[in-house]
Amino acid sequence: EDLDEEDILLRNKCRKMSDDELNSIVPVWATDVRKMELPINHPMYSNRIFMQCNVDKLIKNSTNLYDVVFNKKFDGFWHDESRFANTIERWLNKECVDPPMWDISQNKSFIISDGRHRTVLAQYIGVKDIIVSIPIYLKEDAQELLEANELIEK
């Protein structure tokens, strides 16, 4: 993997973080359309809604997380290290990150179609509930399986 100096410094910063420091991170989710990287997924422009759900239940009820590994050592031996380090840095700086997207796959299983690493990272740092973007037609499934509650747009 080719790393620039900024990536190396960021990984080194994360490598030095204690478990207590990691657990004190508060995720900041972008629900304001102006702050989203992919605003096309905002309820204003899509058939999606934001819901707050239990992260453990989200992971348990999503079938496509088998290859997502979070190794807190930041030792350069795992391919998604930069994704985790960049998300940690953004959250430390109180910068918004798009919520994960929960969908149903072609074989009718539930998946996280975007934001798998953000989801696993949130669980690792001890977050109980996260915000997810789901299609309106999965609202009842989310309420039942994920203990989800719809966020009211302000």
Task: Outline where the language-model segments fall.
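A short, basic-hydrophobic beta/loop patch
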Residues: 94-149
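Short alpha-helix boundary/capping and kink motifs at helix termini
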Residues: 1-16, 20, 25, 41-111
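Solvent-exposed functional surfaces
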Residues: 7-35, 127-129, 141-154
